[in-house]
Amino acid sequence: GTVGGGTPILDYAKNSLRGERIVSFQGILNGTTNYILTNMANGMTFKAALVDAKKMGYVEADESLDIDGFDAAAKLVILANWIMDMKVTIKDIKRIGIRNVTTSDIKKASSNNSAVKLIASCNKDLLVSPQQIHLDDPLCVNGTLNAITFNSEHSGQQTIIGRGAGGMETASSILRDLLDIRQEMARR
């Protein structure tokens, strides 16, 4: 549940795509970095956007977990192992965070009708990196939202979007996990 905060990514893959072979997925798995990048697109510097995210309570105690892509990479490992039945660790992820994204990068993306987003992807390779995403792409969400697109063998692309960063979102996902554990224990 804590993969995606208030967005039930694992539940969706487990239940809604049951019987479907997921061949790849990509998405925004860290609401904090999405919030920072959204604020940068609205004219803030990276530093000011980070300070604002801290004031809102979105940033991990160790900010490098968010801005250097460690949080997104850890979630990518969980998803790859759970959904794709891979056997990967954090060491298998190529990771580039948002620390070096500049206002110039943001403006360049905007001039291409795109936005810079920290995207975690599981194709042949596992990658977390800032990428230009076209404004019409369903992954181009703003604020603390998370989004993930599953590419499945028969159903094609399916995207789910929901709240990512924040105390209530995390609490919701933990409660969902606890209820799942309780249900599983009741079956035994």
Where are these regions (language model features)?
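A short glycine-threonine-serine/GTX helix/turn-capping micro-motif
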Residues: V23, E60-I67, I160-A165
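Substrate-binding/catalytic subdomain of NAD(P)-dependent oxidoreductase enzymes
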Residues: N39, L50-A147
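Short helix-capping/linker segments at secondary-structure and domain boundaries
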Residues: N42-F46, I83-I90, D180-A186
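Fold-independent oxyanion-binding glycine-rich loops
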Residues: G1-T2, A13, I28, T32, ...
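Short coil/turn connectors at secondary-structure junctions
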Residues: G19-F25, K124, L145-N146, H154-Q157
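Rossmann-like NAD(P)H-binding beta-loop-alpha module
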Residues: T2-V59, F70-D71, I78
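Conserved active-site and cofactor/substrate-binding residues in soluble primary-metabolism enzymes
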Residues: G4, P8, E20, M44-A48, ...
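ATP-dependent carboxylate/acyl-activation modules
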Residues: D136-R188
